[in-house]
């Protein structure tokens, strides 16, 4: 019998990668996406172009223009289908934007996740539920790490336990400044774990680093690499916010993250949580990214520097993915930072 997957945020970066990946594995896909990214970040961030491509390419993809906060609409979909897999990626993804409309941010990220979890529990309890969380659940605690300033990046002191592999899941999510986005995602993160641990359901929470890939509709407030490449390609001014442009992020390609989902789906666990980023394998500072993209595109970046950093922004963040690799030893990265940048620049989605 054909397997069935429900994917929220199905036209977004991780959602659309999930649609492609699982459609090509033979799943029937029910996608939920109401292009709220356009509301958050403006016309340039709309995902409608991506949704159109998916509908044209995959006959086993059915799209629903539904708001995840609307329990009646979500319940109707769950009553119509028995799902084997649920991938919940729909979100308000920017910590800057969250401060403008806290109610919208919280209802989308926390309430919307609760709507999904409760319908999963009631109607498809045998399914595997995967949630895309964020490293922002750790708040600004990573900024307390002992950092060294190098020429183009900040780096962790070599004698620190996190130096070799990055930050693991044991870092506290308490007593820190999260941003309102980090707080709403923390609520959803813990809820997803709780539905696994309390109700005994198969849930996996993936705390993403910087998620990226050629399908990213980059905007100033979200999608750092895609937006930076876009600015350099079209000659638009890019703004660096604080830390001298030396802040470091680990970047994971959308394919590598969705491949994590695939491995988890095949051998699911209950109430599990994983850090999911590029780790030591794939990380970069803003200054390093500018230099690399300039070389790929053969164009000089036009950028300005603002001394004030974004509230709660990480100076250095690299995810330790050792726990996932231990649980799923057959999984590994297929993309490094140079592959990611080359693909974004060659996608032409500017």
What are these regions (language model features)?
Residues 4, 322-323, 335-350:
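Amphipathic terminal alpha-helices
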Residues 1-209:
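N-terminal Rossmann-like NAD(P)+-binding domain of SDR-like oxidoreductases, especially those catalyzing
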Residues 243, 273-274, 287-290, 298-316:
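C-terminal "lid/loop" region of Rossmann-like NAD(P)-dependent oxidoreductases
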Residues 254, 273, 309-332:
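Conserved C-terminal active-site "lid" loop/helix of NAD(P)H-dependent oxidoreductases
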Residues 186, 199-202, 212-227, 236, ...:
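Glycine/proline-rich active-site loop of Rossmann-fold NAD(P)-dependent oxidoreductases
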Residues 51-59, 153-172, 228-242, 267, ...:
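A short C-terminal helix-loop "cap" of Rossmann-like NAD(P)-dependent dehydrogenase/epimerase domains
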Residues 257, 261, 276, 286-289, ...:
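Non-catalytic, hydrophobic alpha-helical segments
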Residues 73, 115-118, 251, 256-259, ...:
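Conserved mid-core alpha-helix of short-chain dehydrogenase/reductase
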